[in-house]
């Protein structure tokens, strides 16, 4: 009798779990807003009480008003448009090359032996170390900025693509041989789908580093862009404008990351992975 009751209660529990799951997914993103909301509230209270000087730490309300001024003057969209153009072009160039060379090195041991040692050495060189060289070689023109961004965007995609291909289970190749897949079918139906999670992770990391590269490029030498706006505001002690620029970088970076995560969910529906 006890077993029958237990067995009868299991479907109900599972049904409740299924009913609750969509709700958790639908409203789960709101939990991520809790910490920023608390920080902003404390920040506003500290600034409002005058604990910290407004020159050092402007209140969130002041920063919002600064955003309003930048939008109405057209300054914000002008700088943001240029920054997005640079970041997008540098990312596409660097990530595209990283994907191509990662695939070549992943499939070919000989290519790996020729290229990987040099690429691993270059990967450890900081952006700030090569920035003076890029300026010396290419000047303060757009080319130096885009190449600097591309350099940072290259390595995450290259490493994750290479590791994704080399991490494919050898048993999948045996299955492909049993099914008499041709070489191009093994690549398109076995290797690349199995390596796709790593490749998408590389793209996410690459986007983040592309934005870091953009900041370095625009802070070191530029007459336009959000980075330039921050540097110009710093010279005139306009801390509220500096914070506005930082928030722009944070928001745009978060939006691009969310887009790639959405792409991951669409392309990796087949993967039954642990979600916590």
Swiss-Prot record:
Presence of the UniProt keyword Cell membrane in the record: yes
Induction: Repressed by sulfate and cysteine.
Highest taxon of source: Bacteria
Family matches, as SUPFAM superfamilies: MetI-like (SSF161098)
Transmembrane parts of this sequence: 32-52, 54-74, 87-107, 119-141, 146-168, 199-219, 242-262
An annotated GO cellular component: plasma membrane
Bilayer topology term: Multi-pass membrane protein
InterPro entries per record: MetI-like, MetI-like_sf
Function: Part of a binding-protein-dependent transport system for aliphatic sulfonates. Probably responsible for the translocation of the substrate across the membrane.
UniProt protein name: Putative aliphatic sulfonates transport permease protein SsuC
Organism: Bacillus subtilis (strain 168)
